Design a protein with these regions (language model features):
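Bacterial Sec-dependent N-terminal signal peptides
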Residues: 1-28
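Beta-propeller blade termini and top-face loops
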Residues: 26-549
Length: 549
């Protein structure tokens, strides 16, 4: 595994300078610090056992053993042997968050990457444009759209590899940026904005007509995220069509929702190029799955199903079988499948055979039962259309929110709270010559892991957290977990917890804990009892009355 040691050194220098700048009498020898930092090397201690959030999957048409996996906040990984081993190929670039990856169908050495995840959560990573590799990921060139922040999809014209479309969602937390549908006709040297809606609306998905790439479909998405809420949708969201390779566009409306729309996923199939599918976030009975049988000119509402979980903004990807136009897969908490052209959907398998929260799916064009699925828990493969799955436990891409270290000797341990992977505990080193292995890590608490802490005097006592302020004290010797979340008194209003609530152990008394909801709590007995130290410290405003856009 490779790491960017120069970037790490720069960050270390910046940190030291920042901390020391208040001490005006102190002189800093930058050259000495830089020399010391360059000698530091990062090493991987995992874990890979749980995977991490996959944003996109690309498989070479010319050599199906070559796969690229785009990770929400873990770069781009490549395998040349069907997943037996992996190599990170994007570590030296300036963005760690990937939203889309595409392989040139005419030359598998040419790979395009769109940085910045294509979801709208508070935890989303953003990017710095579009990258291109001409040597299978060995080297990269940043080609443009530096202010796009989030790329939904990249499409390469199969007739001319210099023609590439990029769906740029634009910044999530603000207006403007590089937003809309962009096109290059010179392999990324220059870019033209061919579909511009407004400063708040980007493009989240695009598809070619499989029989005629001059026909392009695009899904526009109006959105805005604030700390207190997400506005997913608006009057400018919708489905657009071009019949001249992106030169002119028309917004389609016949049969589509009359009200405002949110995130839209599109899909086409070479089995019948007249059919276009769309899953549309909308209000009430207008939401759901839509089908066109005349290349997007008019649409019919099939049902009201849309992706659920934390909201359609987190999913909405759909894929259609290349050989059966009625066979559709929709990404959701559990993958859903329709075998009747979108009229009915059901969970693929039981949904429990693999990790939940799915974002990407590849269908083998030679064997429709062979699928690759990317989820919050990493990459999975099935050869029986989801009846059984195998996980790839060799991708160390978990997204850690917080971590803490204990005071064990000779090697300290780490506890980390990870997105959708729970809380994990593992050693910093082992006596094994192979280093830290998957088997050295374990998961004492599931769900999403957040703030955590070892008791500084007793490394067998660990505090771990689940979303919404659920706090657990865990005994590593007995493997007993106890819920110690503070509770309001009789007659008091319910506590309002952050998704990631703050926890602190007093440096003066290891029995004393501080924990935060809308007020500050203190425990002097390791969480067995709690006392509120403050009133409501928030403004207690109704978030629905705050301006969103």
């Amino acid at each position: 595994m490779s790491y960017n040691n120069h970037s790490f050194g720069f960050l270390l220098i910046f940190f030291i300078i920042s901390v020391s700048s208040s001490v005006k009498s102190q002189t800093i020898d930058i050259a000495t610090i830089a020399d010391a930092a360059n000698g530091l090397k990062m090493r991987s201690i995992g874990p890979a056992v749980m995977g991490g959030r996959i944003a996109d999957i690309a498989v070479s048409e010319q050599d199906p053993s070559n796969w690229y996996v785009a990770v929400g906040s873990g770069g781009l990984w490549k395998t040349s042997n069907n997943g037996i081993s992996w190599k990170p190929v994007f570590d030296s670039q300036t963005s760690y968050s990937i939203g889309s990856v595409a392989i040139d169908p005419n030359n598998s050495q040419v790979v395009w990457v769109g940085t910045g995840e294509n979801v709208s959560g508070r935890h989303v990573g953003w990017g710095d444009g579009v990258y291109k590799s001409n040597d299978g990921g060995i080297s990269w060139n940043r080609t443009g759209l530096f202010k796009s922040q989030h790329i939904g999809k990249i499409l390469i014209d199969p007739r001319n590899s210099d023609v590439v479309f990029v769906a740029a969602e634009g910044p999530l937390w603000s207006a403007g940026g590089d937003r809309g549908l962009y096109k290059t006709i010179d392999g990324g040297k220059t870019w033209n904005l061919v579909l511009e809606i407004d400063e708040n609306t980007g493009v989240t998905d695009i598809e070619f007509d499989p029989s005629n790439p001059d026909i392009v479909y695009a899904a526009a998405y109006q959105r805005r995220r604030h700390v207190w809420a997400l506005l997913s949708g608006g009057p400018k969201s919708g489905i657009y069509k071009s019949s001249d390779n992106g030169e002119t566009w028309s917004k389609k409306s016949t049969g589509l929702p009359k009200g405002e729309m949110g995130k839209i996923g599109l899909a086409v199939t070479s089995a019948n190029s007249d059919i276009v599918y769309a899953t549309i976030e909308a209000e009430n009975s207008e939401k759901g799955f839509y089908k066109s049988i005349n290349k997007g000119e008019s649409w019919e509402h099939q049902n009201e199903y849309i992706s659920g979980g934390t909201g359609p903004h987190y999913y909405q990807e759909i894929e259609v079988s290349p050989s059966n136009p009625d066979l559709i897969y929709q990404m959701d908490v559990f993958i859903r499948v329709s075998r009747d052209g979108g009229k009915n959907f059901k969970v693929l398998g039981t949904g429990r055979e693999k990790h939940s929260d799915n974002h990407a799916l590849w269908i083998d064009p030679e064997n429709g039962k062979h699928l690759l699925a990317g989820s919050d828990g990493g990459l999975y493969e099935t050869f029986d259309e989801g009846s059984t799955w195998r996980h790839f436990p060799n991708l160390p891409i978990a997204q850690f929110y917080k971590l803490d270290l204990d005071n064990s000797e000779p090697y300290y341990n780490i506890v980390g709270g990870a997105q959708d992977l729970g809380s994990l505990i593992g050693p910093s080193r082992t006596m094994n010559t192979e280093g830290v292995r998957n088997s050295d890590w374990y998961v004492p608490l599931g769900a999403d892991g957040y703030d955590n802490a070892f008791d500084p005097e007793d490394p067998n006592t660990v505090y771990m957290e689940i979303q919404e302020g659920n706090l657990v004290r865990y005994d590593r010797l007995t493997e007993e977990g106890m819920d110690i979340q503070p509770q309001p008194g009789l007659g008091e209003m319910a506590e309002r917890w952050n998704w990631d609530s703050p926890l602190l152990i007093s440096p003066h008394n290891n029995k004393r804990l501080y924990y935060g909801s809308q007020r500050l709590w203190r425990s002097d007995d390791q969480g067995n009892s709690w006392k509120s130290l403050s009133p409501d410290l928030t403004t207690n405003r109704n978030r629905y009355e705050l301006e969103m856009m």
